[in-house]
C-alpha cells in the first residue's frame, strides 16, 4: 500500500465462497480491517444468491460490516444471476459490478462465425480457455444476440461495446 501511495483499500472483494472457513470468521476479520482503517468497504465476487444472503444476514446478526457490492459474471451473453443474485442485491441495497461485461471480446464485434480468434491472443492461443472460450460461446444463440447488438449499434452509430455496456 505504501508503494502505491494508498493508506486503505476502498473496496475489498472476497473472490468467492470459502467452504473451509466459517463465514462468521471471514466477516469478523473483514470488520476488524474496516475498524483498523485498512479497508473502507467489503464486497464479494462469484457467490450464489443464497450465499450472498447468508453473508448479509450473518453480518447484520453479528454486527459486522455488510457488503456494499457484488461482482458476478453478468452480460448480454450470461444472465444467470437474474433469478437469485440480482434480487438479493436489490433487496439488500448491494451494488452490482459485473466482471467481463464485454464477454471476453465477444460483445465488441471481435469474434464471429467467420472471424475465429487467431495469433498471440488469449483465445487465439487456446480457444477453450476460460468461461469466455470461443468453442463454448460459438453457438447460434451467441450469434443471434450479437446480431441484435450490432443492429442496435449501427442504428445509433455507436460501437457494439457501448450497446453492451449500456444494457447493464
Annotate each language-model stretch with its function.
Residues 1-7, 37, 156:
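A short, glycine-centered helix-capping/turn motif at helix boundaries
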Residues 21-168:
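Beta/alpha (TIM)-barrel catalytic core signal, keyed to glycine-rich beta->alpha loops juxtaposed to Asp/Glu
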